[in-house]
Each structure stands twice: as structure tokens, then as C-alpha cells.
């Protein structure tokens, strides 16, 4: 039978705003990319798909987390639009990987209003959340059903499929835009979208929610998005390639060197003037900011590309004479722009030849895409993570500086006919014959020497310039120093802030492992390993700007000599770049073979001067000395740690009342501590156990000579512990109050006995001492008599109401905390009342009944004996004092039992989700004769939120209690009806379950009423708290408290019984206002 819709009109499982925010967060954060097999995950802010498992903590937002800040903004935007009765639009878009970082533009800034983003973005989905009038009729769904439907759509969306296939790698630049659903604000789809409309649920008294989504049709392949800037760069690059190709066909190799750059210089100058704004260039250029600053200065130069505008600063800075160096520097600047969108620095030598125009190469496209992703990541982190690097743009930077550095980062791959031309260009741009490769032709070397002035030292643009004293340019020195600092910051940011930069990618070629992230941006290992490698490869220190040359040139042998010969140039500016140098040693340990290294050393011997050799020796000696000092420091630290742990162990072995568990594991040192293998493990017994367990590990054969001494020492310690701690309960407690003075005499006596035992040479003295202590302790326990519970109040067992608990059983001496279920003497199975508790002031009765006089009343011997301060006879079955005291935490528990769980559910006009929650179970001591202790369980509902667990206004609540073995202890079923409960009120229900004998023989009619009450034995109890919200919704809040017996359904043998349940609630008043 379908429930009446009108009866459900006032009750909704979610608030309208809360439900709307849950939908928006599910759309925006339900497929957060992550590096896993699934590729995506729901964030902590999304509504849970299932009930929370036991132990799962509720997420607490923090302002330090960007995702939490974004979720807060989403919540505020959705709430604002909903309060203004405006439809909400959520758009899901993709941005190109080349120009946008992993984080992408945020919705809080003005980036979304940029027309470039609107032009570059690919719209995937458009969600419309629109309030509509309340739906009437039989066809309706609940809010939870709509939430499940939206979750299913998000799970099977196109974006989720891409993330799943790529394991979270692509797409990374996902943009969500939340705004009002206005036609003027909507962005257009690239194709005709498909629309899906979800069923409409009612979310409030007069409003329903209509959710629809328009999505792009399924794509066969992942779209390759390109931005407008890189599209323009590609156009210029294509025209430059065509002109150079024609020049190479019509002119000889010698003429190409001079005519190709000059013919394309005007195009390059035009390109620099027509680039994007400075901010876009800084993000999208794909180069670190020091190189970006150089290009930015090129763009801002007033010159139009003529040789006279650029030649003067080149000649003044580099010291070149003639036009050869000038023309080659212009050629290098052209190559910089040309190599940006085309060539990847990770392309191997066999793939570095140019593809014919018009023939697409998918491998090259994938490599270009990978290169652009790395470039975008570098630029983004330099903007958002290192704002200080942006100041580089304000400094003057010469154009030739960029032309000499750019070929290092972005080497150009040309066809085999132009290889010699590029080798000569590299050697000339470096400005020193030392940088030439062994494969250079003789003509190139003669040209280099003729262009360099004799007796004049040319300034190099590598990272280690060498200038004579007095000729150094302070401007260039400061720029080089800042560039080195920026590169060091790049490596730190990409390692510590952007772990996604190290996602493993499929190898495209055998040299793909030499890509930019693996070559430059890797963090160093520990200093010890680095110093060892630095000592072995002192002569092979690679500068960070030359790493990208690996795998890009066709002649592999020409790379290694140039790489090594450059490393011998030393300057004081080398010091801040040691982390990068070490990093490259680690990432490329096989880049220089021993044979190649020997050849390079032989080659270097003829080229280096004596000063360079002395500097290299000094650097190698410095590395060796640092390695030796580091190793000495490590040894000293290890020795200090071993001595400290040994002192801690000896301190723990000493006899005092603060006995702790020794977890120190000593490092064995054969010379200093041969006997450090002994461990003494003591269990914490300060209020838990009255006996001390001493565990001795066997001694190894190599330490037999110390066996007797160690055993005697251990016997002293163990016997002292046993004599001073394992005594009667009263003595133990009084000993704590009196102080350590009483233990000194015992310690002296036990030491004398231990000396006699050790002098006899018995290796089993420890066991003998332990056994003697146990016999003495058992004899003392047998002589101990039962004490009244009020005696325990003398020994520092403080409680909230004065009723104290015992830590040790008075007869057996066993600790009650280590035995959660004490043994009992009676087999009745009921909660026997401890008569001694009735004498305590906290449990005294306030009844006006007169006290019983034994002498005057002749029938008193036939009635159950009662104390003069006992409560009324109607509460003898623990329905009064014990029940209220335990439920209100007025009794201290003896112990806690872990592992209990409970499944909470409800049914009525709707069925909320069943929850499985942990139960905190504790037990108590109710008598001196070891009667069975009842258990109290508390189910905390605070993890569900401030309101609690939503239940129907009337129906049943079912609570199933499971023990640690996952078997059912009790199933509580409580029927309730709170339809008359007003808003913002609270009440409670308490259900008691008694075991009642079926047949009773009343021997004495005078005690008939009394016997009926005493025969009803309380077996189970459940206490439920209810409250109503402002809208009239009913919640089970705060906690659920249970009382249950230790043994399930165990009563007197042979007695027939039945269980009867009674549910009670307040009557006057039935409901009270919420606090």
C-alpha cells in the first residue's frame, strides 16, 4: 500500500539548501582526479553514498586546504542563488594543457571573464538546477533517489571515463563555473549536446527541484586542445620552416649560415611584437622566468629587427668583432621561437630529423604535448608558488643573453644536412674554442679562431663564466646569480609542491627517460651518497642548462666531450648550484661511460690551463673533506644514540613505581657494549595489575662469560620488584600514599637475599625468586578477608559521587580490568543488588517510609532483609538506584570492552539508511560476592551531525547489538508515535525488558506484592532521545544508551520464564523545549 502523499507533505529528509549544496558539490567534486587505478575519487565534501563505517571520522574543513576553500565558495554561491529564487547553472569545461596550469583558473578571480579562456575552453556539461512549483500526484521520488541518480550520471560521464582510462593523468585542467542560468551567460557547445532530465522531487513545502544536464556527445578520442597563442606561434613557425627549407635548397651550406637567419629576421621581429600580453606570456611561454624575462625584453625593445639595433649590445657584451657572431646570435633567437611548439627536448637522436611538411607524426605530436605539459607546470609554480621570481622581469636583460641560453633548453632538431651548421653555431655562440665538439670540422675551428680576438677573453653565456679581474660585468653577474637561484627554486617546487609532475608516462623511445623533468627537476638524495658520487665523478659536473642536450643531437659522441669540457670551468658562482649538479649525477649515472670519460679526460688535459686544473683539484679535495667530515659526524651521532638508549634502558630497569614498557632497541656495538642484548620488559601495573612480569631474553653464546653477572643483576631487580609490588591490596594502596620510604627496606632485604643466591652460582636464581614471590603473595591473599565497599573509599579511588570502585578482587587478588567478565558464584543470572551500596550517601533513599525495627516487628524475619537507609521496596530489582546511576554516569566503570557494534534503523512513512556504529561498552561492580556485572553500551550519534539521525514522525526504531564475535546479543524494537511533538522540542523513551517466571507459587499472601516485584528481573534496557527541528522533523540525537546482561538469556535452571517489555515516556510534560 502506497503511503498518502498528503501525509508526507511536511516531512523531508533534507533541507532544501542543504540538499542543493550536496548536489552542487557532487557535480563539482564527485570526480576529482587522483593517481590511482580508478583515476578519480569523490572528495570529502560530497554526500556519502553509503552509511559511515565504524571508525570513519567526519571531515572537518580547514582554511589551509584549497579544496575546502573552494567548497566553501561553492556553498555560498549556491545558497545565494537559491535564496534569490534563481536557477543555478554549473558548467564543466576543459582547458588546453599548454597554457593553463594543473590547478587552472579559479572561479573566485576574474579569469573566467577572459575572452581567451572562453575561446580555448571545451564545454563538456551544463547542469541546470531550477526551483519549480510543488509536484502533486502519485508519481514522485524522494530526495535520496535524485541524489543517487546524479551520482550515477557523474560516475558514467565522459570526463570520468577519460580519467579512468588515463588513471587520473588526463584531463588535468578541468574548470567548473557556477552562475545563474541566464542565456547570456551560457557558453556554447562545440557540437549539438544531448539533454537528460531527472525526475523531480519535492524539497520543501511548496517547492520542487528540477535537474537537467546537457552534455557533449561521446568522443571516440580524447580531444587535443590548442590555445590561440600556440596556434599563432605554430603559424609563424611553419612560415619560418618553409623559408629555411627553400634557403637550404637554393644556397650552399656556408651561405645558409648567414642568409637563412637574415631572411627570417623580419618574421622573428614581427612575431615578438605580436605576442600575447606579458602575463599570458609568462604563463604560456613554456620557459622559466629568467628566459621569459629575456624574451619579454626582446618584445619591448624599440628596435624593429634591424642589425644596427641589435648589433651594438651584442658587440659590447660579448666582445665579438665583425658580423659573423651577430648573425649567428640572431639565428639562435630564431631557433628559440621555432623550437617552442615543435621539438621536444626528450626526442632521441634517431627521431630528431624533421618530418616533411604536411605529413603528421603522431609520435611527435604526443611528445610535443608532453613537453607543453611540463612547461605549463613550471610556469604555473613560478607564478603561484614563488612570487619573488616575478621580479626578474623588472631587471634589464640583454637580447643576446636569451639567444645564447635558449639553444640549451630548446635545441633544434634539423635534418642531417644541417648538422654541421648547428655544431658551428653552438661553438660560436658559446664564444670559446673549448666548447667545440670533437666532430667539428677544421673549417669551423679556423672560422672560430679568426672571429675571436687574440688576447681577449670572450665572455661565455654558460652557467660558469670565466672573466679576468677587472673585466667582469656586474650586471651580467647579478643576472646569472638570480638565474641560478630561480632554477634551484624550480627543482624544489616541482618535487615538494607538485607530486603530479612525477607521474610515470609510457616511454616513447629508448631515450625518453632523459626528458626535462627527469633531467633537471629531481630532488637530491642524502648528502652522503651525493658526496661519494661527487668524489668519483669530480671531473664530470654537469651544468643544469646543458642537460637538455642529451638525446637531441644526432652525434652522441659530440655531446659528451662538450658536456665534460664545460664542467671544468669553475667560478665562485658554482656554489649555489651544487644541488642541481648532484641531482644530475643521480639521474644520469650511466650517461658517461668509463671509456668515454677516459677519452674526455685526455681531451681535457690538452685544453685546460693550469689554473683550471688547480681549481678542479681544490673542488675535489673539498668534496673529499666534506665526505670524511660527514661520515665522522654520522658515527658520532650513532654512538650518542646508542649511549642514550642504553641509559634509558638502565633507567627503566631501576626499581620505582613508574614501571613502563621498555621499547628501546639498542644498536649492538661489539667494542663498547657487548652486553646490550638484554631487554627487560615490564607491564604497566600502576592501577592495573598487582604483579610484575619480568621477561629475560636468553644470552647469546658469545656472551657466556657475562651470564652469571647478568643473571644475578636481573635477580636483584626482579626480586625487588616482586617484594615491593606484589603484596596485599591494602598494603599496596597504603604504600602509594606513604611514599617510597617503605620500599627502601624491602629493597635492602631482597638485595641481601639475591647476593646469597648469586654467590652460590645458580643460574636459575631469577625463576626461584619469582616462584618464591608468588607463593608468598598467594599466602597473603588467602589470609585477606572480605572488606566492606566503604573501605575502598580511603585509597585514592575518587569518583564523581563518592561511590568508589575496586581495581583488584578482594578474594582472588586478580585485576578486574584485565578480566572484563568477572567470575560469579551464583547461577541466577540476575543483577544481584549490593546491599553495601545502600549505605553510601550518594545512593541514599529519599523515601518517607519509616525505618524497620527488627525487635518490634515480629514478621520482619519472614520478609527480605532491608537496610535502614534502603529505598522503597518497589525498586529492589535495580529499577531505581543502579539504573539511574549507571545511565547518568554516576558510577565509575571497572573496565571497557571493545569490539561491540550496533546497527541502527527506523521504519515508518519513510525508511532512512541503516547505520552501523561502534558501541562503547563498560561493566561495573555491584556486589562483594562476585555477582555478574551488567554491561552498559553507549552509541554516539554526534558523528552524524548536530541534528542526529533522521527518523519518521511515527513508526519503529530497531537497534541490533553485536558482540565482538559479530553475533547478535539483543535486537531492540521500540514502537513510538511522536506526531504530536511540536517543533523545537525534545523528549525521550525508555524501554525495559524483564524476565518473568510463567508460574509463581505465592507461599505467603502478605508478601505477594513484594514477591511479584522481586521476581521481575531486569534483562535489557534502551534509552532513546528525540528532538524536533524548526521545520518539525524528528531526529534521534545525541546518543542511545543500553543496559544488557553479561550472559544472554541465562536464568535459574529449570525455571520457565518469559520476556516482557515496557516502554515509558514522560507524561507531565510529555515534551519540553530544546535548550
UniProtKB/Swiss-Prot annotation:
This protein's domain notes: The protein contains 2 transactivation domains (TAD). Each of these domains may be required for transcriptional activation of a subset of target genes.
Keywords: Nucleus
Compositional bias annotation for Polar residues: 703-712
Protein name: Atos homolog protein A
Keyword Nucleus appears in the UniProt entry: yes
InterPro entries according to UniProt: Atos-like_C, Atos-like_cons_dom, ATOS_Transcription_Regulators
Organism taxonomic ancestry: Eukaryota, Metazoa, Chordata, Craniata, Vertebrata
Protein source organism: Mus musculus (Mouse)
One GO cellular component, as annotated: nucleus
Subcellular location: Nucleus
Region (Required for macropage invasion): 878-935
This protein's record includes keyword Nucleus: yes
Chain segments carrying region Disordered: 430-469, 570-592, 703-766
Region span, Transactivation domain 1 (TAD1): 24-32
